Amino acid sequence: MKVSVNNNLYLSEYFNELPVKKVNKIIRNIIRGKFQPGIFVISISDDENSQLEITPAYIFLQPYYKERHIEIVGLAESHNTAVEDVLVRMTDDCYKLYGNCNFKIYFKDRLNGEVSS
């Protein structure tokens, strides 16, 4: 599995309160394919009809993901927090900047440094 982490990753309040070192370790463990319970990853969908996917980090241990590229744009401690906190902030930021919610363009621009947080 190839994983990239977007610049200025969106984090839930829980992750924002953790030491940066611990957050970096969690991200490294996801990249290395280690089991990470209680972590939900928000990533860019590779489906042309979808924008984002919210999945538990342990899903990436399945063989299906070994050949996929995952671009992580956010982390949360639960699905509800991913939707009610992180996704709401993403939507607000994207809409303020572009007047729409085209997350694929928004995060591509963030990855390229064309958009700051």
Language-model regions: role of each:
Residues N6-Y10, T55, V73, N102:
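N-terminal functional modules and adjacent low-complexity/disordered segments of proteins
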Residues L9, E13, I39, P63-Y64, ...:
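Intrinsically disordered, low-complexity N-terminal regions enriched in serine/proline/glycine
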Residues F15, E114-S117:
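Long, low-complexity intrinsically disordered regions enriched in Ser/Thr, Asp/Glu, Pro/Gly
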Residues G33-I70:
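Short aromatic-glycine-(Arg/Gly/Cys) micro-motifs in beta-strand/loop hairpins
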